A protein has these predicted regions:
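Nucleic-acid nuclease catalytic cores
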Residues: 40-112
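Intrinsically disordered, low-complexity terminal regions enriched in charged/polar residues
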Residues: 109-122
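Catalytic cores of nuclease domains that cleave nucleic-acid phosphodiester backbones
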Residues: 1-52, 87, 102-107, 114
């Protein structure tokens, strides 16, 4: 796969989000579904790509059409944004298997809708 892939920059990328970073994002108005803890949240990004001006975080999930790992992928995006100092608006997240591919913007997943906005506006 990687031999002819000009978009993938890394596989199995370890990421972590410190408790202070979780608190920072929560103070900034992000909705994050994670319990308060004194330990870092850790994980591994399966595939990291640069495509069309976005950093793509891809996670392989068997039976991708039966799972919804939004919280996990949002945490990975927040962790990578914290490490790289890139704004969250430059990230896209996706999960996939051999038959399906689902993609979303993590920024839309963490910001509550403002009064008068609809999901289509964001």
């Amino acid at each position: 796969m990687l031999l002819n892939d000009s978009s993938t920059i890394a596989c199995e990328v370890p990421v972590y989000l410190l408790p202070a970073e979780v608190a920072y994002y929560q103070r900034a108005g992000f909705t994050i579904s994670i319990p308060r803890s004194h330990a870092a949240v850790t994980g591994h990004i399966d595939v990291l790509q640069l495509r069309n001006g976005y950093v793509h975080i891809l996670d392989y999930k068997p039976d991708a059409d039966k799972v919804m790992p939004l919280s996990q992928l949002v945490l990975y995006a927040l962790a990578l944004a914290a490490r790289t100092r890139l704004p969250l608006k430059l990230f896209k997240c996706a999960w996939f298997d051999d038959k399906t591919y689902y993609e979303f913007f993590p920024l839309k997943a963490v910001y509550p809708l403002r009064a008068g906005d609809t999901a289509a506006d964001t």
